[in-house]
């Protein structure tokens, strides 16, 4: 019984290490998003850190339009990054979890 517990504890530690490694890797995964007309471009990591914002000079003439573009485009980029992040972290966690009877449906 204690051997099984130690095995499960080791598996949990491995799963935690795998999740941490995945988080670090997601710092290098870039997500690009742009406004519908391409005048605003944003690049963020899958961990939702902004890396670059490119604004066409045409947008500098209208502050309200620029603000709207920033909000919409940032939200789309964050949504994409969050989907990637959750899928990758979830897969890493699920892959490393020990087989515990009755827990099958919790990590889907």
Curated annotation (Swiss-Prot):
It holds the Pfam family YbaB_DNA_bd. InterPro entries: YbaB-like_sf, YbaB/EbfC. It comes from the Bacteria. Keywords: Cytoplasm, DNA-binding. It is found in: Cytoplasm, Nucleoid. GO terms for cellular component: bacterial nucleoid; cytosol. Its main location: cytoplasm. Homodimer. Binds to DNA and alters its conformation. May be involved in regulation of gene expression, nucleoid organization and DNA protection. PANTHER family: NUCLEOID-ASSOCIATED PROTEIN YBAB (PTHR33449:SF1). This is Nucleoid-associated protein GFO_1796. It comes from Christiangramia forsetii (strain DSM 17595 / CGMCC 1.15422 / KT0803) (Gramella forsetii). The lineage of its organism: Bacteria, Pseudomonadati, Bacteroidota, Flavobacteriia, Flavobacteriales.
